[in-house]
């Protein structure tokens, strides 16, 4: 699996483009830690149109807990190794659309200024959360 590196990712995000991950019948990958860096340390380099990924495999755990992200986060037809964590985050927008294997979403205390969109995504996961002490939840 071909990996999207920081130089390529930042170049597309500065230009306000969409990171395309489809390659030769498979998906290119991006490390979750790099996406966190873009939302935290490198956020001043991201165009106001936001972080937009299409058909990308996000590898590792995407942990945006407690972050304030002033631009939209849009994942279209992306795959995730683990459930994204957005506990206590303040996001402008979060869109996880058409994701074929979304292992859940941990978002206790999440604040979204605009839209939270999970259209066409298949959520398959049971997660323990502090908000539900007697059951598991997918979201």
Task: Tell me the role of every PLM-derived stretch.
Residues 1-139:
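N-terminal leader/targeting and pre-domain segments
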């Amino acid at each position: 699996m071909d990996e999207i590196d920081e130089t390529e990712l930042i170049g597309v995000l500065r230009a306000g483009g969409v990171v395309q991950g489809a390659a030769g019948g498979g998906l290119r990958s991006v490390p979750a830690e790099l996406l966190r860096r873009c939302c935290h340390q490198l956020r001043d380099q991201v165009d106001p149109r936001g972080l937009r990924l299409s058909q990308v495999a996000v590898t590792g755990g995407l942990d945006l807990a407690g972050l304030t992200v002033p631009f939209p986060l849009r994942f279209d037809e992306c795959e995730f190794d683990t459930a994204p964590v957005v506990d206590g985050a303040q996001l402008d927008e979060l869109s996880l659309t058409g994701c074929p294997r979304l292992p859940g979403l941990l978002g206790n205390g999440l604040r979204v200024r605009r839209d939270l969109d999970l259209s066409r995504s298949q959520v398959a996961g049971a997660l323990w959360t502090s908000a539900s002490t007697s059951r598991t939840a997918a979201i």
